[in-house]
Swiss-Prot record:
Localization: Cell membrane
Record's GO cellular component terms: plasma membrane; proton-transporting ATP synthase complex
Cited function: Produces ATP from ADP in the presence of a proton gradient across the membrane. The gamma chain is believed to be important in regulating ATPase activity and the flow of protons through the CF(0) complex.
GO BP: any one term: proton motive force-driven plasma membrane ATP synthesis
Lineage: Bacteria, Bacillati, Bacillota, Bacilli, Bacillales
Alphabetized GO MF terms: ATP binding; proton-transporting ATP synthase activity, rotational mechanism
NCBIfam families: ATPsyn_F1gamma
Principal location class: membrane
InterPro entries: ATP_synth_F1_ATPase_gsu (IPR035968), ATP_synth_F1_gsu (IPR000131), ATP_synth_F1_gsu_CS (IPR023632)
Any Pfam family the entry gives: ATP-synt
The name this protein goes by in its record: ATP synthase gamma chain
Topology in membrane: Peripheral membrane protein
Length: 288
């Protein structure tokens, strides 16, 4: 049985751990609020961008662009968005597991795909598994600006345009709620989806100058880059939600453990006092 000192030391160390997890929970909650606000604000821009691009793409049969056209797939690119730090529950593990499962099902060899990875957790695991990483980015800011990821986004789009790969997917955790993040695969290139859905309005509302084709040449790469940035904002909100939930659970578990240890301490202390009283009474009886 543990001594009173051992139990007391465990109580004190668990209380210190609880202070840390509680602080991390509060910090993550504050970061989550800012990340949600940023993602929601950016969605307004992204929605309008989709509408404009869709209208240009549908404006006439003469408009075309390599980024809108399907081509035979010889190689596939994947952008993986993970976190730089852990303590976020299954945020990274579930994402990596699902992506690698999909890759193994789609491709017979590593020559058929390449990975662009954001986040130290994902990069380190992919290196351990000797996966074909062609570009990486670590130390992503908690509140990233477009300039923070513009280099990676631009090079990803350029690699598709140059034929390094023939299609490009983004893998990230979509924010549903602080307790729920959904692993998401989004096809980025080619941009066939801009011709579909309800995002576009009547082209009669727009007049294009100098021409639809010239505007497409300028706008499409920027639009694709904006999709990468939008996914990153979503992933950041998911990361902070997952970490806040994980730290909340850790704080609750620490509190439960402290209660259990306190009960054990009181019982052990009571037993020690009872033993001392018994010994005193026994000694007094022996002297009579």
């Amino acid at each position: 049985m543990a001594s009173l000192r051992d139990i007391k030391n465990r109580i004190n160390s668990t209380k210190k751990t609880r202070q840390i997890t509680k602080a991390m929970q509060m910090v993550s909650a504050a970061k989550l609020n800012r990340a949600q606000e940023k993602a929601q604000s950016y969605e307004v821009y992204a929605k309008k961008m989709r509408e404009v691009v869709g209208n240009i793409a549908q404006a006439g049969s003469d408009t075309s662009h390599p980024m809108l056209e399907e081509r035979p797939v010889k190689k596939t690119g994947y952008i993986l968005m993970t976190s730089d730090t852990g303590l976020a529950g299954g945020y990274n593990s579930s994402l990596l597991r699902d992506m690698m499962k999909t890759i193994n099902e789609r491709h017979a060899s590593e020559d058929e795909y390449a990975i662009i990875v954001l986040g130290r957790i994902g990069r380190d695991l992919l290196r351990t598994r000797k996966q074909p990483i062609i570009q990486e980015m670590v130390e992503v800011p908690d509140q990233p600006t477009f300039n923070d990821v513009s280099g990676l986004a631009k090079s990803s789009v350029e690699m598709f345009a140059d034929g390094v790969f023939d299609e490009l997917y983004i893998w990230y955790n979509h924010f549903v709620s602080p307790m729920t993040q959904r692993v998401t695969e989004q096809k980025l290139l080619p941009l066939a989806s801009v011709n579909e859905g309800d995002e576009t309005s009547s082209t009669s509302l727009y007049e294009f100058e100098p021409s639809e084709q010239q505007i497409l040449e300028a706008v499409l790469p920027r639009y694709a880059e904006s999709l990468i940035y939008g996914a990153l904002l979503d992933a950041k909100a998911s990361e902070f939600g997952a970490r806040m939930t994980a730290m909340s659970a850790a704080t609750d578990n620490a509190s439960a453990l402290i209660d259990e240890l306190t009960l054990s301490y009181n019982r052990a202390r009571q037993a020690a006092i009872t033993q001392e009283i018994t010994e005193i009474v026994g000694g007094a009886a022996a002297l009579e």
